[in-house]
Amino acid sequence: MLMPKRVKYRKQHRGRMKGKAKGGSLVAFGDYGLKALEAHWITAQQIEACRIAITRTLKKSGKLWIRIFPDKSYTKHPAESKLGKGKGNVEGWVAVVKPGRVMFEIGGVSEELAREALEYAATKLPIRTKIVKRHEIGGEAV
């Protein structure tokens, strides 16, 4: 699973997911990308499930870039524990994804295969997504 090697503080506030993604909203590395249309926490397990789904669809062709990383910890109390007694233990790691963020990119494959792989990966995520293509203006990639 993806998680930070070390962090300054183990436990974090939940925070709020306001607005759209500031960066990472364009396809930068590959030719096709999977873009989020909603804000959500994407867990390390969901990212791994998408990675496996895409690599199995692509087989040995093409290249995959994962553009999100789970760097936020979330905590949980054990089942049937009373209220209080401090903040719970770290349960897992999540990536905060806002609308407009490109989460996965694929390059070096045909459009049909890329679309098939990204559609399959989208079923593993708890948010609505959109498949986007790299924009080329004047013969130059943007």
UniProtKB/Swiss-Prot annotation:
Per the record, the GO terms for biological process are: translation
Which keywords does the record carry? Ribonucleoprotein, Ribosomal protein, RNA-binding, rRNA-binding, tRNA-binding
- Listed GO CC annotations: cytosolic large ribosomal subunit
* A molecular function (GO) term: structural constituent of ribosome
Q: Which Pfam families match?
A: Ribosomal_L16
User: What top-level branch of life does the organism fall under?
Assistant: Bacteria
Q: What does this protein do?
A: Binds 23S rRNA and is also seen to make contacts with the A and possibly P site tRNAs.
Q: How does it assemble?
A: Part of the 50S ribosomal subunit.
The record's comment on protein family reads: Belongs to the universal ribosomal protein uL16 family.
Could you tell me what this protein is called?
Large ribosomal subunit protein uL16
Q: Which organism is it from?
A: Thermosipho melanesiensis (strain DSM 12029 / CIP 104789 / BI429)
Quote the gene name from the UniProt entry.
Answer: rplP
